[in-house]
């Protein structure tokens, strides 16, 4: 897929998505279900197209961050189970049932309200119980101080008549980091997860159909903790250091064209703030891409881009709609030449932005993906 907007555009390679999916499948084993996270319009890649390809590839589940994202997928014909990872107000119960959406529940109170409303509507809501093992966000707290109280609440959730409890999951906070402290904390999170599951299943006689804890970092570094399913988020899109180490291919390439080229004498300032001065007589090319397109201003004077004739350093402060590159050593570069900001041939998105999630998502509002 390629945008028709030729000022600056993103290209999405679904064959690279297929490659990444198969890499993950081999890494965790073919008995483990793969859940594809397609929240935030598939991290800016186009949720519908990504979801349909994942469905063809045999993904077991999808995940979104709000009910509207689920509705978009259902309206497009996607039939895979869809997990809503975060919070949904209980007054949306009818929509949840209508869309056959699986809802995460993080407290007995919210579970009870969902159950009551589902019973009143003559339905049953599929839910996954969310455990907070150290993220400090949503979920039943599994630290020592709250463990017993959370266990009692979860056992009560299992008996609610309007719910079909299908799964249980948690989210690692530092599984993508390899410091000794981070590794130990990730192990602690997994120990808490396993302990709560063992207590719930032993005391109730109930067994969850799906247990999942591995996000990108978990998939890459702890495949032995795959349980029944892993959640493939940013790593599926080939972005970040972990994806690179696993041999993933970037699904998105961000490209633009040279707008114009100007000659400067040595010692002349480029762009806002006079943060860069030419060190010699220079040819400076202007690109029609800036921080409004996701090329963060903090990257000013730090990155390189790829022209048809080699790499060029970005110089001067990145503007809202434009940035400049030094093509002094690339005399063949001319107006209209295609320039790759990141993609298959240069820079993973992690290098091209402080936070790859933000970077990939930022292109959606400016470019037709």
What does each model-identified segment do?
Residues 298-299, 306, 333:
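Short, well-ordered loop/turn sites that connect or cap secondary structure elements
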Residues 5-6, 40-57, 112-126, 133-257, ...:
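Active-site loop/helix belt of alpha/beta enzymes
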Residues 290-292, 310, 341-345:
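Short, surface-exposed secondary-structure boundary micro-motifs
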Residues 1-102, 108, 116, 124, ...:
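A charged N-terminal "starter" segment
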Residues 254-302:
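Functionally critical, mid-to-C-terminal surface segments that flank or help form catalytic/ligand
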Residues 358-365:
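Conserved small/polar residues in nucleotide/adenosyl-binding loops
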Residues 346-355:
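Short, Lys/Arg- and Gly-enriched loop/turn segments at beta-strand edges
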